[in-house]
Design a protein with these regions (language model features):
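A conserved beta-strand element that flanks and buttresses the S-adenosyl-L-methionine
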Residues: 277
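Class I SAM-dependent methyltransferase SAM/SAH-binding core
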Residues: 198, 206, 210-258, 263-265
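Class I SAM-dependent methyltransferase Rossmann-like catalytic core
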Residues: 153-185
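C-terminal alpha-helical "lid/dimerization" subdomain adjacent to the S-adenosyl-L-methionine
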Residues: 310-355, 363-365
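Conserved alpha-helix/loop element of class I SAM-dependent methyltransferases that forms part
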Residues: 176-193, 214, 218
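A short glycine-rich, Lys/Arg-flanked "PGG" loop and its adjoining helix->strand segment in the class I
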Residues: 291-303
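Transmembrane helix boundary and interhelical junction motifs in multipass membrane proteins
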Residues: 42-55, 60-70, 75-85
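Conserved glycine-rich SAM-binding loop
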Residues: 203
């Protein structure tokens, strides 16, 4: 078994938020929570929505936070229009007619009938709105729940960050589940059964955390049918320039992985690397330094070892421009407003890696996203070119 991680316990607030974010996590429960929440929002019982959401969540085992958020889609900005529609719908259902919009009509209005119309129309609109919202949620969430084994695995890997900050935990949950590269690494047979894995520019260590969690899950007998055999005894190394991100990786992995805070161009590399992952890193360094970095890593790899390089394809039109915009915004938020990026086309990346003694294939890696990402799967030749 892998060594146990040395982590501090999450705070009470973190545990409460964790419960609210993760309870009722199946596809059907998600749909019921959104549908019932919107039904509560449309209901005429104004002032009781919070209590109704808590009670429904407890009664049916649904996510109370999502119930309440869905209820608040019917907010004060649109509530007057909703109430008007409910009264008119109720009047039409009760009497076959609607209220005339005149002062005389309202002056002779029967309060009892008005209240009955509001209740009747509100309940009908509540049921219809809830059904539509629930069905749409169920359909739209289909892709997310298409692979429940991987969803469960990513959730467990993200939980390693729970005691750091809620932001780091939420980022890990979203990134591991939404970025197709992580599932590809586990399901495509690229992981060696043993040996050395190096993640260059590992950030908070998401890939390493996922591999470590996969190893633990496999030891416990939880491994998806049809997937390649999981790693066993794989030594994990991460290299990260940013101290804060490196600290998060150390927290999540403990003594399961060695995390080095260093510039990848100067870092100490382990010997006989079996798999090197370089995700979204090379474009961050100047072009003259890209080749030497690849050569330096290649020199530390075994013959036949694998290098996985994920980059954006600069020839991909608007999808590449979207990547470029996202990177620019991220750099601004990190205070790196003068950052420069050295992008290349997928063909140019392939040529660069081939020049360092790799047999390279290109796999699209933007499924489910609007981004022009590709994964270069580079196998080091047994006899490298001089």
């Amino acid at each position: 078994m892998p060594s146990q991680r040395r982590v501090r316990a999450p705070s009470r607030l973190q545990r409460v938020i964790y419960t609210l974010r993760t309870e009722g996590g199946s596809r059907g429960q998600e749909a019921w929570a959104i549908g019932l929440g919107l039904a509560v929002g449309f209901s005429p019982f104004i002032g009781l929505h919070l209590g109704m959401c808590v009670a429904l969540g407890w009664l049916f085992g649904l996510n109370r936070l999502k119930l309440y958020l869905a209820a608040n889609l019917v907010n004060p900005l649109i509530m007057p229009g909703v109430l008007f529609a409910e009264v008119q719908l109720g009047s039409w259902l009760r009497s076959g007619d609607t209220y005339a919009l005149s002062r005389d009509a309202f002056s002779f209005m029967d309060p009892w009938h008005f209240g009955l119309d509001l209740l009747l129309g509100g309940m009908v609109l509540s049921i219809l709105g809830g059904l539509v919202a629930g069905v749409l949620t169920y359909v739209l969430m289909g892709r997310r729940y298409r692979d429940p084994d991987f969803t469960r695995l990513t959730a467990a890997a993200a939980d390693r960050y729970l005691g750091t900050s809620l932001t780091a935990w939420e980022f890990a949950r979203a990134k591991l589940r939404g970025d197709p590269v992580y599932r590809a690494v586990l399901a495509s047979g690229w992981l060696p059964a043993s040996g050395v894995l190096v993640d260059v520019g590992c950030g908070p260590g998401l890939l390493l955390a996922l591999v470590a969690q996969a190893t633990e899950e496999a030891h416990d007998g939880h491994w998806p049918d049809g997937w390649p055999a999981p790693p066993d005894g794989l030594r994990l190394h991460g290299i990260e320039l940013r101290p804060r991100a490196a600290d998060l990786a150390r927290y999540a992995l403990g003594d399961v992985a060695e995390i080095q805070t260093s510039d990848a161009r100067e870092a100490r590399l382990p010997e006989a690397i079996d798999l090197a992952a370089i995700f979204d890193v090379l474009h961050l360094i100047d072009r003259p330094s890209q080749g030497p970095l690849v050569a330096r890593i290649a020199a530390a790899m075994r013959p036949g070892a694998l290098m996985l390089v994920r980059e954006a394809d600069a020839a991909a039109g608007w999808r590449f421009r979207l990547v470029r915009l996202g990177n620019r915004i991220t750099a601004l938020f990190r205070g790196r407003w003068r950052a420069r990026f050295a992008y290349r086309t997928a063909a140019a990346w392939q040529a660069e890696l081939s020049g360092h003694g790799f047999d390279v294939s290109i796999a699209p890696m933007g499924e489910g996203t609007p981004f022009a990402n590709v994964l270069l799967v580079a196998r080091r030749q047994s006899t490298t070119a001089s």
